[in-house]
Design a protein with these regions (language model features):
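Bacterial signal peptide processing site
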Residues: 25-28
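The serine-hydrolase catalytic nucleophile loop
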Residues: 92-104, 216
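Conserved alpha/beta-hydrolase
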Residues: 105-123
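Short beta-strand/loop motif that positions the catalytic acidic residue
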Residues: 198, 204-206
Length: 277
């Protein structure tokens, strides 16, 4: 992946009355007939395939089309405003839709939130090769370029793995990364190998009854510099997005840890403020 920051070309439409070109799909699918699939996407969202689950939440923010360094069209929703931001990276069985309810919660707490579809998911374009880290780099650069210099990345499952790898690659470093149920490796991208290069605080979360995911989280945590890492293993079979979406004791414990992390690393005075992407 190129380590230079992706150049953004974007088009914004007010989302009051607008909708995303997406359904909350459970796997990457080809876009509907007429939707853009080339490296030169249309400048704004189409209304061809509206996801009913996304519609109410998406209208609370701005629907966007970002373009990453490879020229892929990345769908996103921008919620809230201000100088402290959160990028939300989805699971492999979903799209940005799954993050919007929690994104609204964070926006109401004063964070600017960007949820996006990885290339090949939701309503983003379908590439020949996935560009996970570039997609996250593009999302972070979007916020930094628009008055939100301090950013934490939160990822769920697949998105957690990609968030760790992207956080290790982005310069200047992001202010933190939270990985909910991260597999060590997904689609050839290895979070355990990237973790030693992290220069920001990291919180790893997993349920002890969620298969081997607690083992994975512990391995990535162990590979992270000791002064930057934190691990939370809860008694639960919950996975990824469920930790912030469900109403269970384990979810409450995780949400509290996530929001404490955000306060500690976004609301305190930074040692240095990023001056570029």
């Amino acid at each position: 992946m190129p380590r230079s920051v992706a150049t953004l070309r974007w088009a914004v439409m007010l989302a009051l009355g607008a909708t995303l070109v997406t359904g909350c799909t459970e796997a990457p699918t080809a876009p509907p007939p007429g939707a853009p699939t080339s490296a030169s996407p249309s400048p704004g969202p189409s209304l061809a395939a509206v996801g009913a689950d996304c519609r109410p939440a998406a209208t609370q923010g701005l629907t966007l089309r970002l373009v990453n360094a490879a020229g892929h069209s990345i769908s996103a929703v921008d919620l809230g405003s201000g100088p402290i931001g959160v990028v939300l990276a989805h699971q492999s069985d979903a799209s940005l839709c799954q993050w919007l309810p929690y994104g609204q919660v964070l926006a109401a707490k004063g964070y600017r939130v960007l949820a996006f579809d990885f290339a090949g998911y939701g309503s983003s374009s379908v590439p020949q090769q996935k560009t996970y880290v570039d997609d996250l780099r593009t999302a972070v650069a979007y916020l930094r370029d628009r008055g939100t210099p301090r950013v934490v990345i939160i990822g769920a499952s697949m998105g957690a793995t990609m968030s760790v790898v992207a956080a290790a690659a982005i310069t200047p470093p992001v202010d933190g990364v939270i990985a909910l149920s991260p597999p060590v490796t997904f689609d050839g991208v290895n979070a355990e190998k990237a973790a030693p290069s992290l220069k920001c605080p990291a919180l790893y979360v997993a349920g002890d009854a969620d298969g081997d995911y607690a083992v994975y989280a512990k391995a990535i945590n162990q590979a992270t510099p000791a002064d930057l890492r934190d691990l939370l293993v809860v008694s639960s079979p919950q996975h990824g997005i469920q930790f912030v979406a469900a109403d269970t004791p384990a979810s409450g414990q995780v949400r509290s840890a996530v929001e404490s992390f955000l306060v500690a690393h976004l609301r305190t005075s930074p040692s240095a403020t990023p001056s570029n992407k």
